A protein has these predicted regions:
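Basic, amphipathic alpha-helix used for nucleic-acid engagement in HTH/winged-helix/SANT-Myb modules
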Residues: 1-28, 34-92, 136-139
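Short, basic interhelical loop/turn and adjoining N-cap
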Residues: 42-61, 107-127
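Short coil/turn residues that cap or connect secondary-structure elements
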Residues: 29, 94-95, 110
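Sequence-specific DNA-binding recognition helix
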Residues: 100-104, 108
Length: 139
């Protein structure tokens, strides 16, 4: 389980990609209220699934054993359901290969969305914009 406040190796990349998605929504969605643009930004495709291969392997292996993952937020559950679906398909096309290979391939493939809440996106985007204004881009 992820520890509160832990930061993944790819968090800065995810945040930059989310900000770019938001800026694209701003540029192309005339007449849409700002509060709705965060939701539009997170529903756009992402370059990968924003979860570590290790954590995804833990959850997918549990799902393959028949364990449920009902204790997760809806967006996170939807992400793991999509990863699971793709892992099952990948294994069907690549019999005999380990689950870890399937998870690695899937997690590093394009994702249909960011799997974040609108509120999370808003917090991330405003934080990045604040850092950009102050010149504090350490992330």
């Amino acid at each position: 389980m992820k520890k509160k406040g832990s930061i993944s190796d790819f968090t800065a990349l995810r945040n930059r990609e989310l900000l770019a998605s938001f800026r694209d929504v701003l540029a192309t969605s005339r007449g849409v209220p700002l509060r709705d643009m965060f939701g539009l930004a997170v529903k756009r495709p992402a370059s990968r699934f924003w979860v570590s291969e290790y954590r995804a392997a833990e959850v997918i292996c549990a799902m393959l054993r028949g364990e449920t993952i009902d204790n997760q937020l809806p967006q996170r559950k939807a992400m793991y359901d999509e990863i699971y679906r793709r892992v099952v398909e990948w294994r069907r096309e690549n019999p005999g290969r380990p689950v870890s290979d399937a998870v690695t391939a899937v997690v590093n493939s394009a994702a249909p969305e960011f799997y974040l809440t609108e509120k999370s996106a808003k917090v991330i985007i405003y934080s990045l914009r604040r850092k950009n204004k102050t010149g504090d881009n350490d992330e």
